[in-house]
Amino acid sequence: MSSRRKPSEKRRGRRPQRFERPRGLVVTEGTVTEVQYLQMLQQELPRDAASLKLIGEGADPLRVVKRALRERKDGDYSWTVCLVDCDNHETLQDALRLATKENIRVLVSNPCFELWLLWHLEDWRRHSSSRDIQARLAKLKVLQDKSLTSSFPIGRYADTRARSGKA
């Protein structure tokens, strides 16, 4: 007579299969605001969204792309993105060429990343300096120095995408 297990006993000891989230590498020109924003966004997104490694390089665009290349060699990433500001960087074109050659996406904020933050709050379409945008964010009490405040409306990222498409 064979020993038969109950269906519930058969399942015991089996581990459910783990879903592997895609891993992304994001290297930013900024060391505070961009990294903080992406951390907040990652918490807002569904748990099965990508797992991000965030690095604030704090350098010109070419150094940001080169850092992404170094980091990418050490990890198994599904994709790599660099965030840089347009500013007046002499290295921007070289960074874009290298990134294209190495299959790295570069998102260039014009004039600065803080414009993306402002779009969480209002439809801002006029040409402005980085200083003007940062001053507006401070007046709205969502940016203090370079740090986002707890009142920053991270949940409005869908509105932000729509506003950026109109600008």
Model-derived features: positions:
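Short hydrophobic beta-strand that contains or immediately precedes a catalytic carboxylate
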Residues: 26-29
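Short phosphate-binding loop-to-helix
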Residues: 59-67
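C-terminal accessory helical subdomains adjacent to catalytic cores in phosphodiester-
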Residues: 2-4, 9-23, 35, 39-55, ...
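Acidic, metal-coordinating helix/loop segments flanking the phosphotransfer/catalytic sites
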Residues: 66-74
